[in-house]
């Protein structure tokens, strides 16, 4: 579980530390950094030369994302005081200590969704995923439709059908 996140020099942040609980809500006015917190977490699990450009997010070059108001020379993101990623555009360098994606499982669903289609893609490489833009949602639903959900804490009404598909139907009909 992610308990603490420290962000230095990224966008609106000079240096800030967040503590997380089992359920954490990010709320506030526009342009206060809510999206930046999510982007920092995604940058920690995204692979490549620029962790801000890839599968989960594509928000720009490191030089564009540094906090210009305080003259940040680098961006540093730390999770749980254990996993660190430092990025500088001077040498186009990313230095990582530890690999967060080995410790936690992330299912990120972007607010940007694909529209209605006549057909939907199939994930051949990993059929047990939904896709960042929910492009494999129908495949995932079909694969897990009859998965048993007895004694699952996510079940709201025990009188509903206690399968994954039954729970999806229950919430879509509400």
Show which residues each predicted segment covers:
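Pre-Walker A-like glycine/lysine-rich segment at the N-terminus of P-loop NTPase domains
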Residues: 1-42
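Phosphate-coordinating catalytic segments in nucleotide- and nucleic-acid-processing enzymes
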Residues: 47-174
């Amino acid at each position: 579980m992610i308990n603490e996140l420290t962000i230095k020099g990224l966008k609106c942040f000079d240096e800030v530390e967040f503590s997380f609980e089992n359920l954490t809500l990010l709320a506030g006015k526009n342009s206060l950094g809510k999206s930046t917190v999510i982007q920092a977490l995604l940058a920690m699990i995204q692979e490549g030369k620029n962790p801000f450009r890839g599968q989960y997010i594509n928000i720009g070059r490191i030089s564009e994302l540094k906090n210009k108001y305080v003259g940040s020379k680098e961006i540093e993101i730390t999770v749980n005081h254990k996993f660190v990623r430092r990025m500088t555009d001077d040498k186009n360098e990313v230095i990582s200590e530890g690999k967060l994606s080995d410790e936690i499982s992330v299912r990120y669903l972007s607010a940007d969704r694909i529209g209605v289609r006549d057909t939907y893609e199939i994930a051949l490489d990993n059929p047990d995923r939904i896709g960042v833009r929910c492009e494999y949602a129908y495949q995932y639903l079909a694969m897990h439709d009859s998965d048993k959900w007895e004694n699952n804490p996510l079940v709201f009404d025990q009188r509903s059908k206690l399968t994954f598909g039954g729970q999806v139907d229950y919430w879509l009909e509400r």
